[in-house]
């Protein structure tokens, strides 16, 4: 049915176009004959218009009616480039009229939809705007400052933590060199004679209730070595020197020490020998054996190896 309808529309359109062309050709031929009969002076605008109206009202001439409809001013102003033949078909007229109605009514509806949509969007933006603005104020303020401060402090702490282990590994292991002065017989050293000999050799009673040999003989400056009691409790504390007695005293120095370790050892050994001579005692090693040249060489070798390991 659709194909048959399309064929009929095409055939009708062709027939109307042929009829229109024939009418135009006939009208043009008749117009030339009429203008040829009249003089030029009688041709004006006032006479031409009544003749067109007379041609329009003549019911016998179909071609004049078609010609009048084509030259209608309202039709030419609206669609000057459209084909006049197609408009004469009723099927095509229905199609065009339906499209025109849809265009006329659809455009206002589209505009109304846009207006309503814009109004709703504007209302939703105004309602949501305060909540959206407040959120960044709560989030951005702590994030812009605190991470930088945390990074700065964390970097400094990391440097301190790295420096501390390095300083600890540089420190050498503490070593102690010990000499002893022991009484020769069963008679112990009496405090009066013992303390007098110690003071004459530059030892000063001080911290931890023992005697110390300082850099200065007056008892000031760094401690080079110290002297303690061989017997329990190890201190040389006394209220009355005459009532104090012990079987021996211990000399000790630490490695590392202030100054030169070998010179401090020689000074400690010399002091121990003088006190032993004053009291009639013997100089012993750290195991409380009599001091021998080999053991003294062992002490000095220990000092040299320590200095080489920590040079």
Swiss-Prot record:
UniProt subcellular location: Cell inner membrane
Biased composition range(s): Basic and acidic residues: 32-54
Cleaved signal peptide residues: none
UniProt keyword annotations, A-Z: Cell cycle, Cell division, Cell inner membrane, Cell membrane, Membrane, Transmembrane, Transmembrane helix
Region (Disordered): 32-60
UniProt cross-references to SUPFAM superfamilies, sorted A to Z: Cell-division protein ZipA, C-terminal domain
Assigned GO CC terms: cell division site; plasma membrane
Segments in the Periplasmic topological domain: 1-5
Superkingdom of origin: Bacteria
Segments crossing the lipid bilayer: 6-26
Pfam families for the chain: ZipA_C
Parts of the chain on the Cytoplasmic side: 27-311
Membrane topology label: Single-pass type I membrane protein
Record-level GO BP terms: division septum assembly; FtsZ-dependent cytokinesis
Functional note: Essential cell division protein that stabilizes the FtsZ protofilaments by cross-linking them and that serves as a cytoplasmic membrane anchor for the Z ring. Also required for the recruitment to the septal ring of downstream cell division proteins.
Subunit-level organization: Interacts with FtsZ via their C-terminal domains.
UniProt family annotation: Belongs to the ZipA family.
Name used for this protein in its record: Cell division protein ZipA
Primary gene name: zipA
């Amino acid at each position: 049915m659709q194909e048959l309808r399309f064929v009929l529309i095409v055939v009708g359109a062709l027939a109307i176009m042929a009829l229109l062309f024939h009418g135009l050709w006939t009208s043009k031929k008749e117009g030339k004959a009429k203008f040829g009969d009249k003089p030029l002076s009688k041709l004006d605008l006032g006479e031409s218009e009544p003749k067109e109206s007379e041609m329009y009202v003549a019911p016998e001439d179909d071609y004049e009616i078609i010609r009048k409809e084509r030259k209608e001013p309202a039709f030419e102003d609206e669609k000057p480039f459209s084909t006049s033949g197609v408009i004469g078909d009723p099927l095509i007229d229905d199609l065009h009229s339906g499209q025109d109605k849809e265009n006329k009514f659809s455009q206002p509806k589209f505009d109304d939809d846009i207006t309503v949509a814009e109004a709703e969007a504007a209302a939703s933006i105004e309602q949501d705007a305060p909540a959206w603005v407040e959120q960044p104020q709560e989030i951005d303020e702590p994030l812009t400052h605190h991470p930088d401060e945390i990074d700065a402090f964390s970097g400094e702490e990391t440097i301190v933590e790295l420096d501390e282990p390095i300083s600890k590994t540089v420190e050498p292991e503490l070593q102690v060199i010990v000499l002893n002065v022991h009484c020769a017989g069963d008679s112990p050293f009496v405090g009066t004679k013992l303390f007098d000999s110690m003071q004459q050799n530059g030892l000063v009673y001080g911290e931890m209730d023992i005697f110390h040999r300082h850099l200065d003989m007056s008892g000031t400056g760094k401690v080079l070595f110290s002297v303690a009691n061989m017997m329990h409790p190890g201190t040389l504390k006394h209220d009355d020197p005459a009532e104090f007695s012990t079987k021996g005293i211990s000399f000790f120095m630490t490695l590392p020490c202030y100054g030169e370790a070998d010179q401090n050892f020689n000074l400690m050994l010399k002091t121990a020998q003088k006190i032993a001579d004053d009291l009639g005692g013997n100089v012993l090693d750290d195991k409380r054996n009599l001091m021998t040249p080999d053991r003294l060489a062992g002490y000095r070798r220990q000092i040299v190896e320590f200095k080489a390991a920590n040079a």
